[in-house]
């Protein structure tokens, strides 16, 4: 954010509610015809707050259809089903180490609407988006980790829900604990 401000871009930081979720009314007021990018986390890495990315994507599409929507899905990938096209997400970032894959590798989903420029110029690898040798073992490890995260996905989600309910039930029996 600071880098963009230093480059002369106007940056708007939006308020969140008591649960850490971006206030949609504030977003709606902040969106303007000259808005070029909105970036949110899908799940906050510190609080666990889940952003309403589908609603945000629809709002951006309606209010400023030329703007791009970036979602940091690093905490969400493998734990939620994510539908970039349906949710009007143009850029989606994921990191391998958050899904038990190798460190130092990830991916950026880029919708055809998003015209991005490479950060490192050179050899033209990765469709001209990044110079240098592909990290083939890391990429393969990310692929395996992603596949494993989504195998039996519904059963895993149900199991985690049951664990959460069991923990909440146990904690609620302790005096002075508020959930």
Feature locations, PLM:
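Pyridoxal 5′-phosphate
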Residues: 1-179
